[in-house]
From Swiss-Prot:
Chain residue ranges for the region called SH2-like: 218-320
UniProt organism field: Mus musculus
Gene3D superfamilies xrefs: Adaptor protein Cbl, N-terminal domain, EF-hand, SH2 domain, Zinc/RING finger domain, C3HC4 (zinc finger)
Pfam family, one: Cbl_N3
Stated name of the protein: E3 ubiquitin-protein ligase CBL-C
UniProt entry tagged with the keyword Metal-binding: yes
Activity regulation behaviour: Phosphorylation at Tyr-340 is necessary and sufficient for the activation of E3 activity.
Knockout-associated phenotype: No visible phenotype.
Length: 496
């Protein structure tokens, strides 16, 4: 029997490239042993060995791979781009650090506020992004970029419709695809968009980077408008800034409570970190959990917490972005209602506690449960969905009620308030989610089949199938509304 063919990349010299990258990281790790290199997150001393270990796992998995199902934009292309970028960024770090055995050279890199220190901090952030990206697309070394589930449903549909199973695209191609849905003027604005999206600074956009971007600048219908107001025009936005640098920058405003700046979190990619001066002059940093930044800033302004962006008097008005989204509807068939009734239950009842109604939706898998059960589940250090074991990347407060039938033209008018690209995307199903463990708790979902015809599919949810014990006759469906509603969400203080 002939031996199984190795992946194409493995045959083209990929093993040597991976080995060379690991050796480079090991050399950099030796240069970072100076005690003065101990900094807040992200720390090169921590990132370099972790990245080297993950690359070793990738090499092992690639060596043992029996087939190579990925085409253009798959594992081969991603690794070629990743390793080339790693070599470039690694050399830049090596030039900034003192050579081995010459500790008296390049001393400016250890001086707080120096240009060399700032360059090193930015490179540490890039290495942090690269490690997070590799971990997301190659968990435990095994490629799963073609199965990657974006957190926001509309973003997932956009990527899979336009990019298929590819996990990485050249910037020029991605730019044209995005602009077809969200137009952007060429020139400085387009360049600013590239610098925000391209977290690893390699001239490409991966599905992971797009996921982070869409989580930061949600909701989808006004994605780039949100980005322009928050990242381009807002004086409080800081790109590529670390926890320590935020503390340093706000020192100048300790006598001006209400001063604040915000940045993408480097420890929780896809979420925001806000640094601000409290009423007693303390400098605090917090990460709002699963809530759009513009809502957090507006509430902070109302409460007198976020008043002076980067110490400036003018606080931009973000109210134009806080519009109520149209209701998101899901459909429950009559047979499903009968099934719930047979179990002495209802659709809206949380299937974990069986006491409270569902009021929160887990992202990206879309499962519904009550916020109390979700909080208790996460307090037990469980960061995966209790139904499908998909990673919990976000959550959305919802309100469930049985809807009254509306005339078709009225329903269409409400739905039409979303942009065309969003409307088209909403008519497609989400891609598959591969759970890491079997479900342990009851599951909810609606059956797929011929009876689905005519159902509204705005913002469809990827939920597990609920199978009835006996076949039931097809009956008319009943419309339910799952309504996103604003509610206060807890905030977590960033401790690292």
């Amino acid at each position: 029997m002939a031996a199984a063919a190795a992946p194409r990349g493995w045959q083209r010299g990929e093993p040597r490239a991976l080995s060379r990258a690991v050796k480079l990281l090991q050399r950099l790790e030796e240069q970072c042993r100076d005690p003065r290199m101990v900094t807040g997150p992200p720390s090169l001393r921590d990132l370099l060995p972790r990245t080297a270990q993950l690359l070793g796992e990738v090499a092992k998995a690639r060596r043992e791979a029996r087939e190579d199902p990925e085409g253009p934009g798959g594992a081969d292309d991603f690794l070629a781009i990743y390793l080339a970028n790693l070599e470039v960024k690694g050399r830049q770090v090596a030039e900034l650090l003192p050579p081995r055995g010459k500790k008296d050279v390049n001393q400016d890199v250890f001086r707080e506020g120096s240009r060399f220190r700032r360059q090193l901090a930015k490179l540490a952030l890039i290495f942090s992004h690269m490690h997070a990206e590799l971990s997301a697309l190659f968990p435990a070394g095994k490629y799963c970029g073609h199965l990657y589930q974006l957190t926001k449903g509309s973003a997932h549909i956009f990527w899979r419709q336009n990019c298929g199973v590819r996990c990485v695209l050249p910037w020029a191609e991605f730019q044209s695809l995005l602009c077809a849905c969200h137009p952007v003027e060429p020139g400085p604005t387009m360049q600013a968009l590239r610098s925000t999206l391209d977290l690893t600074c390699n001239g490409h956009v991966s599905v992971f980077e797009f996921d982070v971007f869409t989580r930061l600048f949600q909701p989808w219908p006004t994605l780039l408008r949100n980005w322009q107001l928050l990242a381009v025009n807002h004086p409080g936005y800081m790109a590529f800034l670390t926890y320590d640098e935020v503390q340093t920058r706000l020192q100048a405003y300790r006598d001006k409570p209400g001063s604040y700046i915000f940045r993408p979190s480097c420890t929780r990619l896809g979420q925001w970190a806000i640094g601000y001066v409290s009423s007693d002059g303390s400098i605090l940093q917090t990460i709002p959990l699963n809530k759009p930044l513009l809502q957090v800033l507006l509430k902070g302004q109302k409460d007198g917490i976020f008043l002076f962006p980067d110490g400036k008097k003018h606080n931009p008005d973000l109210t134009e972005l806080c519009r109520v989204e149209p209701y998101q509807r899901i459909q429950v068939s009559e047979e499903q209602l009968l099934l719930y009734q047979a179990m002495n239950s209802t659709f809206q009842l949380c299937k974990i506690c069986a006491e409270r109604d569902k009021d929160v939706r887990i992202e990206p898998c879309g499962h519904l449960l009550c916020s109390c059960c979700l909080a208790a589940w996460q307090d037990s250090d469980s960061q995966t969905c209790p139904f499908c074991r998909c990673e919990i990347k976000g959550r959305e407060a919802v309100s469930i009620c049985q809807a009254q039938e509306r005339p078709t033209e009225v329903r269409t008018a409400a739905d039409g308030s979303r942009d065309n690209c969003h409307q088209e995307a909403a008519e497609q199903k989400l891609g598959p989610v591969i759970p890491s463990a079997p479900s342990l708790l009851p599951e909810d979902q609606f059956p797929q089949g011929p009876q689905d015809k005519g159902w509204l599919t705005l913002a469809p949810l990827a939920l597990p199938r609920l199978r009835p014990p006996l076949p039931l006759p097809k009956m008319a469906s009943v419309l339910w509304e799952v309504t996103s509603r604003p509610r206060a969400r807890e905030e977590a203080t960033e401790s690292s």
